[in-house]
Amino acid sequence: MEEYQGYLELDRFRQHDFLYPLIFREYSYALAHGHGLNRYMLLENIGYDNKSSLLIVKRLITTMYQQNYLIISANDSKQNPFFGYNKNLHSKILSEGFAIIVEIPFYLRLISSLEGAEIVRFYNLRSIHSIFPFLEEKFPHLNYSADILIPYPAHLEILVQTLRYRVKDASYLHLLRFFLHEYSNCNSLIITNKSLSIFSKSNPRFFLFLYNSYICEYESIFLFLRNQSSHLRLTSSGILFERLCLYRKIEHFAEVFANDFTGIPCFLKDPFMHYVRYQGKSILASKDTPLLMNKCKSYLVNLWQCHFDVWSHAASIRINQLSKHSLDFLSYLSSVRRNPAVVRNQMLENSFLLNNAPNKLDTIVPIIPLIGSLAKAKFCNAVGHPISKLTRADLSDFEIINRFLHICRNLSHYYSGSSKKKNMYRIKYILRLSCVKTLARKHKSTARAFLKRVDSEFFQEFFTEEGGFISLIFPRASFALRRLYSGRVWYLDIIFINGLSNHE
């Protein structure tokens, strides 16, 4: 029964909404590291002593609260590197505890809301590519889109206030506020892109939780107003937890504009409005007129400024006509184009041709940003001329080729749904020639001389198309199957953007 002691304590603290004591429980950090309570119990018996031990956590919190925590002698830091003030170690240890503990109320609330209901898991919806079939189905029938760059909160207090409606433990929120302010800068509490980048890399789980809470607050209010104004309730939105004083906040927000809450903005009543988001970028598409789209733009800017105290300017939202402009989303350039088609129709003895031009969503590979990513990774220069990869010249030939092929396959799979493959062929050519130049430099030869020495099948996989693999595996595959495979394919197992294609 000892192995369940930690879980019983978690449940007892949850009943009283106490999270602060969990920071001083060592099993919280064991769970944060993925060890589990069973492993924690075993390690405790043999003298569990790592950087997340209870004694170190207590001393770090005490040090953080002291007024003179920056005055630490160099000798003390050398003698006790864990107890001396190390900002990176300090923030990493505490943020791991904050992340695992603050998720407990949300997880338990989710479990209680799903009691007695069958949980249906759609694993394919985790894929980034699952967004594009939705876009292909809905966007060809729409007229305008708003390309929205969601602003980051300019002050750390906004993140704490967002959690205040969900976490009731004042002591925990006070320590969280103190930790965030101390970590950012004692002189500046303004979040900059540089500080966000450093914080997200050193504390990824904690940063993602805070940012997702902020995004969830913004989207839940927007969807709430959307549902109140529409007779067609949204069925595809995820589970949104109810927050305290939501209606009071909405009413206060309405008072800012001197409008009654019952006066729903007219653009929200559009039944053809669709919204998609990934990370900090979202698209709001509609069949409305440009006037209503501009009203929607002003509404969103006021929502961020008046409700979230986030400074946002009109340039962060660009309204474009789908038939004339492309959308830069998820490293694709998507645009609605007319697809002309001629259909022969025959009625009794008369036959005639029908010219049909339905709208179609085209997704193409953005060649210029992708070449910029390849140049940054030293595969080519700024204009796209391949160069040798110096850091891989000390590897074996087999390892060099495999690493280049791995990058090529990942990019090929990610852009498999592209309407036009020409840009992808150019990227493959750059990677292939960069691989050849790397091998030639390793063997102290020229690229032309190296290609003459090796077998013609040495780089065959660089030229093998995606449709060619099905011919190798199924030699007697039908023509229809080959044509289907060589067309646009959305892989539903891609859960993150390739590093080279993530140029946003």
Swiss-Prot record:
A single BP term in Gene Ontology: RNA splicing
InterPro entries assigned to the protein according to its UniProt record, in alphabetical order: Domain_X, Maturase_MatK, Maturase_MatK_N
Gene Ontology CC: chloroplast
Major site of localization recorded for this protein: plastid
Location of this chain's protein in the cell: Plastid, Chloroplast
Keyword tags: Chloroplast, mRNA processing, Plastid, RNA-binding, tRNA processing
Highest taxon above the source species: Eukaryota
GO function terms (MF aspect): RNA binding
Role noted for this protein: Usually encoded in the trnK tRNA gene intron. Probably assists in splicing its own and other chloroplast group II introns.
Family note: Belongs to the intron maturase 2 family. MatK subfamily.
Cross-referenced PANTHER family: MATURASE K
Protein name (Swiss-Prot/TrEMBL): Maturase K
The species this protein was found in: Quercus ilex (Holly oak)
Gene giving rise to this polypeptide: matK
